[in-house]
Amino acid sequence: MALNKKGAKRRRKKVCAFCADKSSSIDYKDVNKLRKYVTERGKILPRRISGNCAKHQRELTLAIKRARNVALLPFTTD
């Protein structure tokens, strides 16, 4: 890998997991998949950390919010 100006390695661009796996859809009822994109404190992971594309990040955010409203996911942890 090439080094940047400060001598640190450049990070490899993450590939969107939903684009790579064409058959997977984002569903608010699939709690196990949604938990991967939520921190232990209950916050939704940003795109630059999760590696999702913009389209799937928007769908993922909507699905997480729906799951929270239906009480499948907690809003926060105790």
From Swiss-Prot:
The keyword Calcium does not apply. Keywords: Ribonucleoprotein, Ribosomal protein, RNA-binding, rRNA-binding. One of its GO terms (cellular component) is cytosolic small ribosomal subunit. Coiled coil: none annotated. Binds as a heterodimer with protein bS6 to the central domain of the 16S rRNA, where it helps stabilize the platform of the 30S subunit. The keyword Cell division does not apply. Part of the 30S ribosomal subunit. Forms a tight heterodimer with protein bS6. One of its GO terms (molecular function) is structural constituent of ribosome. InterPro entries: Ribosomal_bS18 (IPR001648), Ribosomal_bS18_CS (IPR018275), Ribosomal_bS18_sf (IPR036870). Belongs to the bacterial ribosomal protein bS18 family. This is Small ribosomal subunit protein bS18. It comes from Clostridium novyi (strain NT). It comes from the Bacteria. HAMAP family: Ribosomal_bS18 (MF_00270). It holds the Pfam family Ribosomal_S18. GO terms for biological process: translation. The gene is rpsR.
